[in-house]
Amino acid sequence: MSENNSVAGIFSGHGQIKTPTYKEQAYRLIKEAILYQRFQADTIYSQEAICQELGISRTPVREALLELQKENYIRFCRGKGIQIVSLDDQAIHDILEMRIYLEMAGAELAAQRATKSDLDYIRECLEANQRHHSTDNIIQNYRIDHQFHRSVAKAAHNALLYNTLDDVLNHYLRFETLTVYQSQTFAQSIVDE
């Protein structure tokens, strides 16, 4: 029986298995909290408090926050912490305008380039959207709806278009969830009176 301890090339093209780093996990959790209005816009949050809540050190949290700053979700307040960037009327207008343009371009390219498996996946997303549209879980509805829109963009086979639309959809999700949050807050204030 021959023994060969070399496995070089056996997994070529696949790379090493990688679990999400603390930075990636912090980025995902903080971004999700921003998108779903768990952070209040224009409120200053301590980086130290975020680190404690996540149970990780400052470095991965800081790296995640720097990335979120580049994406215009947060701003740093020198010596105080971070602040969630609020969506003003102009930002909302820009997001809506960009979404319309990107989705039109994506749909046109998808109509020309989509494979059978792309079309099957689009159909699955559309059916899921229709099944869940009547449920009371608004956040789940948004996720499913956005997955449908992402499936069309993915079928365009243009990575730049897909990535840009993905970013725009995330910013749009902030607007959608903010609207729901404000409606619920308003309704609760009426009930409380």
Task: Please give the residue ranges for each predicted region.
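Short linear motifs at protein or domain termini
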Residues: 1-108, 112, 160
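C-terminal regulatory/effector modules of DNA-binding transcriptional regulators
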Residues: 182-193
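Short helix-capping and inter-helix turn/linker motifs at the boundaries of alpha-helical repeat units
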Residues: 21, 120, 139, 186-187
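Mobile beta-alpha loop/short-helix "lid" or hinge segments that flank ligand
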Residues: 70, 74-75, 166-171, 185-186
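Short glycine/proline- and charge-enriched loop/turn segments
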Residues: 10-11, 176-181
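Short, flexible turn/loop "capping" segments at secondary-structure junctions
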Residues: 75-77, 145, 188-189
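Conserved amphipathic alpha-helical segments that form helical-bundle/coiled-coil interaction surfaces
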Residues: 95, 112-178, 192-193
